Amino acid sequence: DRHKCMNNQAIANKYQQLRRAVLAQAQNEFEQFEADFIGHIDLTEITEDAIRSQDEWDIPVNRQIGWDWRQVRDQYRRDHMARVELAVWHGEELCGLMIGKASEGKLVVKINYIQGGEVENPLKGYIVPIASRCAELFAVAIEADWIGIQDPIDDDDLLNYYRELGFDESDPFDPRNNALFKRVVVDED
């Protein structure tokens, strides 16, 4: 069905443009917020370079994650047009990765996978705020009211940190789901 195929391509292109706009806006906001970032920070999609750089991270065993970034990225590219992809760079150094997607009914944009880089990376402490802002900008663009972090790692410090960033509600659509939600705030300007 060629028409459906072309229509899907048009939708895919729309989301591609949206992802790029979100990355550009988030980068711009963080550069304004932290002048030291200008000329150093770069937000991109999860490129081959990003996957290769992530492979080289020296992550201690207790911070290992249970997924393969290449597999996750390829699966999301295949199955989810309305996805968010983020690689956070400081110069040539990859500092974090995130991938997420909009729910079927576009009610929520979820951060499904997120990982910060090596312990001493120059953007330590910024990965979650940057990822969260990207999810939020994507949500605003598709008129979703919520962003969420799916299956957050069960670590008290981390969970408190997520709450401080505003992820302090349980899933309003499925109370049994292990996720932290935050209502999207749209700037009235």
Language model regions located:
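Non-catalytic substrate-recognition and accessory regions of acyl/acetyltransferase enzymes
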Residues: 1-125, 130, 137-148, 163-189
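Short beta-alpha junction loops
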Residues: 151-155
